[in-house]
């Protein structure tokens, strides 16, 4: 099971976070293990927005192992140091939850491959999205729970896709939740309903 929803506002912006939450909540009977949003927000396009995690939500139903929260701070310090070493500057930093962060980064690059590989080589760290307008937010629980946890009802943008998941092929964790960032491309996200064999 699982469910996918998407919306596009042509030539205008709207409250895509709230709208997609309503659509995904209507699909909760298709799966409530995790829910993910790929939101394309209104930005000035100057800085990269990087959503990443330094740990897993180990709430009810999670297949992840509990970690000491202090390890999240250590991982964040290494991420910050790596970003600085690559000549980038963290312009804005938000820590939504102990394991979930959002950075705006001033970084002159067209190739995100080396950047993302260096960040993701840090044990326990995963980039959920990177781009000038894309933000992938995903976590355990149904659409309303995730929307409330991350205040997505305030996000204004032009389009969005989302996924309500019932885990059948992998664990109940953030890493396995959809949508996925189209690594290493800026502002690309994908969601699907089945296994993809390459």
Give the positions of each predicted feature.
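Conserved small/polar residues in nucleotide/adenosyl-binding loops
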Residues: 196-198
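N-terminal glutamine amidotransferase
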Residues: 1-193
């Amino acid at each position: 099971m699982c469910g996918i929803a998407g919306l596009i506002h042509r030539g205008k912006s709207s409250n895509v976070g709230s709208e997609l939450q309503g659509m995904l909540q209507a699909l909760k009977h298709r799966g409530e293990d995790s829910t993910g949003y790929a939101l394309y927000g209104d930005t000035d396009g100057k800085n990269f927005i990087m959503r990443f995690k330094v740990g897993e939500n180990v709430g009810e139903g999670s297949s992840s192992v509990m970690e000491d929260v202090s390890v999240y701070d250590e991982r964040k310090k290494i991420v910050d140091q790596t970003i600085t070493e690559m000549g980038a500057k963290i312009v804005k930093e938000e820590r939504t939850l102990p394991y979930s962060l959002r950075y705006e980064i001033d970084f002159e690059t067209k190739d995100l491959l080396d950047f993302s590989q260096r960040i993701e080589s840090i044990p326990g760290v995963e980039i959920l999205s990177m781009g000038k307008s894309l933000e992938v937010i995903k976590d355990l629980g149904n659409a309303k729970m995730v929307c409330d946890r991350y205040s997505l009802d305030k996000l204004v943008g032009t389009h969005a896709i989302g996924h309500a998941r019932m885990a059948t092929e992998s664990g109940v964790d953030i890493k396995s939740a959809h949508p996925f960032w189209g690594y290493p491309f800026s502002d690309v996200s994908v969601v699907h309903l089945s296994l993809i064999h390459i």
